[in-house]
Amino acid sequence: MKALSFLFIPVLGLLVCGQSLCPIDKAISEKIQEVTTSLVPGAVRIIGLDCRSVTSRGSLVTCPSGFAVTGCTCGSACGSWDVRAETTCHCQCAGMDWTGARCCRLHIQ
């Protein structure tokens, strides 16, 4: 009988807290929300994304210093490309006439 009552307690807890948060979980969630609401918008406001497009003749193009590749494009209807060292786009088709890259960096305003 004692074993049965010990099994009943966790089940009762699940029934009480099943769909909604328990009071302690709700209090913790509210506190986390309160703290992050005041911190995150302030941090996000001062961080910006600076992006630019660069092109070059041939099969390689490199982003300016401090920028990283976010996408590549190739001439001659070539759709095969790869990113090298996070800063250079390489078009893999033979006889490339041009290669382009979209380069971005985070900056603090």
UniProtKB/Swiss-Prot annotation:
Chief localisation class: secreted
GO terms under cellular component: extracellular space
Signal peptide span: 1-18
Cysteine disulfide links: C51-C104, C63-C103, C72-C89, C74-C91, C78-C93
Subcellular location per the Swiss-Prot or TrEMBL entry: Secreted
InterPro entries, alphabetized: RELM, Resistin-like_sf
GO biological process: positive regulation of lipid catabolic process
Xref: Pfam families: Resistin (PF06954)
GO molecular function, one term: hormone activity
Top-rank taxon, per record: Eukaryota
Statement: the UniProt record of this protein carries the keyword DNA repair: no
UniProt keyword annotations, A-Z: Diabetes mellitus, Disulfide bond, Hormone, Obesity, Secreted, Signal
CDD domains: RELM
Residues forming coiled coils: none
Function: Hormone that seems to suppress insulin ability to stimulate glucose uptake into adipose cells. Potentially links obesity to diabetes.
Subunit relationships: Homodimer; disulfide-linked.
UniProt similarity note: Belongs to the resistin/FIZZ family.
Protein name per Swiss-Prot or TrEMBL: Resistin
Organism field: Bos taurus (Bovine)
